[in-house]
């Protein structure tokens, strides 16, 4: 790797352990490494929620320890226009979007790459994602990270092979405990820092309070599948299919104490439809329709393909048959019924370790009952 010394890599430094160790690994491989901290949120930066200041301090501490420069950039306008506005629009029409996927597409691998190119003269960018890249026949493929528990390829399916060719993923071959051990051995400030679980760049907020500041609250009835009103909701946007917690309803008059689950949203009448039991037929689907398709490096499908699909992060792969439709959408048929298929979320397709691409779930095929 002696020629890496001529190559400049800009690492997206989030202030977390994964990007910290990524920067060190690239140093060990001989690259010229610099860091970039992206600030992507301006609203209500109060101390109760906002972690941006402490994240920046952690990123600075790590870069000081490693002896590398840290640049900063503000992408708040791009984030608002290209990620957050879409996020709110989807919630407003009753869908449940995944902002992290859009954030990766628009910010972490578009705005970041353009800035690294134009302003910092980068040969590559790097992030602390648990994914791998493989170059086959002149095109870069996206592969799952080796740590099954942390694999993040689901979030990166919107990347194209040309983008991937400019990206390095140093920890994709490592397990999370090994990453933490390396950070501890190096004495990095982020070694014991817990993983973030909040919305991409917005941090650990009380989601209901946060959403309520941007969208009008529209209370309505919670209705059982047999038409009985069993409670009230504060807004359909606060609920997602398969949700159990936070409904505030107990057993029914007939004595059943099985927990309630959200099985549907009646947008026309602002009603939340619920049923008891997580295997209720109304919650099960035999397939889905996906649109807004993106393929990482292969051509769009022209014939049916057997593969696996993930319909949410950290869910086991589902065996399926994927069939292209005349309108450009995909029909996905599961081998076995699946619970809580959620419009607005992403369906991501795999052949073994290879992430083929994916699309947005537009509709689900309910289990006939």
UniProtKB/Swiss-Prot annotation:
Disulfide bonds join 103-200. The record marks 129, 345 as: Interaction with tRNA. ATP binds at residues 12-19, 38, 128. Residues 98-100 are annotated as: Interaction with target base in tRNA. GO terms for molecular function: ATP binding; tRNA binding; tRNA-uridine 2-sulfurtransferase activity. The keyword Nucleotide-binding applies. Its EC number is 2.8.1.13. It catalyses: S-sulfanyl-L-cysteinyl-[protein] + uridine(34) in tRNA + AH2 + ATP = 2-thiouridine(34) in tRNA + L-cysteinyl-[protein] + A + AMP + diphosphate + H(+). The keyword Cytoplasm applies. InterPro entries: MnmA-like (IPR004506), MnmA-like_C (IPR046885), MnmA-like_central (IPR046884), MnmA-like_central_sf (IPR023382), Rossmann-like_a/b/a_fold (IPR014729). It is found in: Cytoplasm. Residues 150-152, 312-313 are annotated as: Interaction with tRNA. Keywords: ATP-binding, Cytoplasm, Disulfide bond, Nucleotide-binding, RNA-binding, Transferase, tRNA processing, tRNA-binding. One of its GO terms (biological process) is tRNA wobble position uridine thiolation. The active site is at residues 103, 200. Signal peptide: none annotated. GO terms for cellular component: cytoplasm. HAMAP family: tRNA_thiouridyl_MnmA. Belongs to the MnmA/TRMU family. Catalyzes the 2-thiolation of uridine at the wobble position (U34) of tRNA(Lys), tRNA(Glu) and tRNA(Gln), leading to the formation of s(2)U34, the first step of tRNA-mnm(5)s(2)U34 synthesis. Sulfur is provided by IscS, via a sulfur-relay system. Binds ATP and its substrate tRNAs. Interacts with TusE. This is tRNA-specific 2-thiouridylase MnmA. It comes from Sodalis glossinidius (strain morsitans).
């Amino acid at each position: 790797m002696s020629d890496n010394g001529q190559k400049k890599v800009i690492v997206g430094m989030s202030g977390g352990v994964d990007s910290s160790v990524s920067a060190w690994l690239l140093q060990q491989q001989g690259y010229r490494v610099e860091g970039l901290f992206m600030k992507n949120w301006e609203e209500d930066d109060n101390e109760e929620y906002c972690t941006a200041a402490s994240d920046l301090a952690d990123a600075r501490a790590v870069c000081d320890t490693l002896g590398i420069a840290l640049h900063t950039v503000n992408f708040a306008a791009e984030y608002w226009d290209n990620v957050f506005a879409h996020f709110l629009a989807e919630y407003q029409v009753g869908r449940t979007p995944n902002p992290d996927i859009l954030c990766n597409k628009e910010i972490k691998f578009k705005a970041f790459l353009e800035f690294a190119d134009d302003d910092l003269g980068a040969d590559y960018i790097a992030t602390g994602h648990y994914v791998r890249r493989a170059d086959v026949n002149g095109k870069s493929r996206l592969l799952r990270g080796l740590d099954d528990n942390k694999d993040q390829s689901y979030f990166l399916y919107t990347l194209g092979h040309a983008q991937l060719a400019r990206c390095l993923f140093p920890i994709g071959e490592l397990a999370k405990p090994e990453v933490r051990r390396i950070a501890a051995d190096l004495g990095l400030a982020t070694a014991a820092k817990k993983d973030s679980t909040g919305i991409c760049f917005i941090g650990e907020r009380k989601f209901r309070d946060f959403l309520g500041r941007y969208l009008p609250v529209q209370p309505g009835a919670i209705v059982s599948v047999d038409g009985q009103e069993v409670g009230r909701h504060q807004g359909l946007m606060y609920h997602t299919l398969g949700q159990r917690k936070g409904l505030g309803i107990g057993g029914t008059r007939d004595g059943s104490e099985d927990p309630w689950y959200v099985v549907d949203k009646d947008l026309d009448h602002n009603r939340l439809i619920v049923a008891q039991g997580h295997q209720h037929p109304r919650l099960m689907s035999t397939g889905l329709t996906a649109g807004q398709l993106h393929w990482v490096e292969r051509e769009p499908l022209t014939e049916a393909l057997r593969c696996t699909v993930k319909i949410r992060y950290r869910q086991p792969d589902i065996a399926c048959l994927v069939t292209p439709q005349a309108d450009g959408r995909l029909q996905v048929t599961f081998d076995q019924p699946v619970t809580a298929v959620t419009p607005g979320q992403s369906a991501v397709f795999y052949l073994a370790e290879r992430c083929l691409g994916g699309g947005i779930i537009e509709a689900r095929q309910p289990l006939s009952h």
